């Protein structure tokens, strides 16, 4: 699918090993006769292959956009799997494993995968049904969505990982707004386009960081290097740059390009020492030289 040229074999080894790692999952869940276990934990049959292990919080940023470029037929099969999981289990996947909704990780990043596939022209006959599933998953009465819709952010005392959820929901909502516009759903376009700007409500212009709010005020004793319950496997350094859908808006919040570049330089030049809890799984990756984008 991808050929690179290099006079150094080690460069080729690194690249192709990384490419191989990127396609270890999702995994085929269909048997040779078309039977598969879906998100209602019952056995179904489909002539189109179905898949499992959609760890979408890990893969929505880069992996699925890569698939949409080099594995277009397989992406259409992923969309068909999403449709079946929606029909059988009642919602689009967030972090699906072997037909189970694991309840793991945040956001509703299946909407990002679907939107990217749609605008990259992945052939699929039922985008409108997936769009209905997008609206449903973005309006559930749990995981901080009600206060997010009411206040324009998630208060830290009402939901864990409030800053990360606010930021990722805003990105997801931008994706939905683009689908709404493409499908001529004006009312939902206006609603979700407004929600996509909610990231601004957790930006503290005095510090230049995305911070938690408690009862409408900035939470006290804030440190951007602290790993705590307000962020998902990260601290404020990583999440303060997570506005992939509105980089120009983020730059404006910082007061322009010069001040934004200054903040980026702070990110890469600050100490990698973290404060707070030791984050399981990726503690070594949480340093200020890395950011969620």
Give the residues covered by each predicted segment.
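Acidic/polar, glycine-enriched structural segments that form the non-catalytic walls/loops
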Residues: 1-50, 84, 91-94, 124, ...
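A short glycine/serine-rich beta->alpha loop
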Residues: 4-7, 47-52, 97-103, 160-163, ...
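Acidic, mature catalytic/reactive cores of soluble proteins
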Residues: 16-20, 131-137, 141, 178-205
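Secretory-pathway/luminal and periplasmic proteins that interact with or process carbohydrate-rich
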Residues: 24-30, 87-93, 142-143, 200-209, ...
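Extended glycan-interaction surfaces of carbohydrate-active proteins
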Residues: 35-39, 43, 127-161, 209-244, ...
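Aromatic-rich carbohydrate-recognition surfaces in CAZymes
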Residues: 52-180, 193, 239-252
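Acidic/polar loop patches that form or flank catalytic/metal-binding clefts of enzymes
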Residues: 74-78, 125-127, 187-191, 203-211, ...
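Conserved small/polar residues in nucleotide/adenosyl-binding loops
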Residues: 291-292
């Amino acid at each position: 699918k991808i050929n690179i040229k290099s006079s150094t074999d080690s460069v080729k080894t690194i690249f192709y090993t990384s490419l191989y790692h990127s396609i270890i999952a999702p995994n085929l869940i269909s048997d040779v006769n078309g039977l598969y276990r879906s998100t209602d934990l019952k056995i179904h049959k489909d002539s189109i292959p179905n898949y499992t292990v959609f760890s979408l919080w890990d893969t929505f940023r880069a992996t699925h956009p890569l698939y949409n470029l080099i594995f277009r037929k397989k992406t259409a099969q992923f969309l068909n799997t999403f449709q079946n999981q929606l029909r059988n289990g009642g919602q689009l996947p967030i972090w699906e494993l072997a037909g189970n909704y694991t309840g793991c990780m945040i956001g509703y990043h299946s909407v990002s995968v679907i939107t990217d596939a749609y605008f990259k022209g992945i052939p699929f006959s039922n985008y409108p049904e997936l769009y209905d599933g997008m609206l449903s998953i973005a309006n559930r009465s749990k995981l901080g969505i009600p206060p997010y819709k009411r206040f324009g952010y998630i208060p830290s005392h009402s939901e864990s990982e409030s800053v990360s959820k606010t930021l990722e929901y805003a990105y997801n909502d931008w994706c939905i707004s683009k689908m709404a516009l493409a499908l001529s759903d004006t009312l939902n376009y206006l609603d979700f386009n407004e929600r996509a700007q909610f990231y601004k409500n957790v930006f503290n212009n005095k510090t230049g960081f995305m911070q938690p709010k408690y009862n409408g005020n900035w939470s006290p004793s804030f440190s951007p290097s602290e790993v705590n319950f307000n962020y998902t496997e990260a601290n404020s350094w990583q999440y303060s740059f997570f506005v992939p859908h509105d980089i120009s808006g983020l730059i404006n919040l910082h007061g322009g390009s010069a001040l934004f570049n200054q903040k980026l330089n702070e990110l890469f030049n600050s100490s990698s020492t973290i404060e707070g809890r030791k984050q399981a799984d990726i503690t070594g990756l949480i340093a200020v030289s890395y950011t969620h984008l």
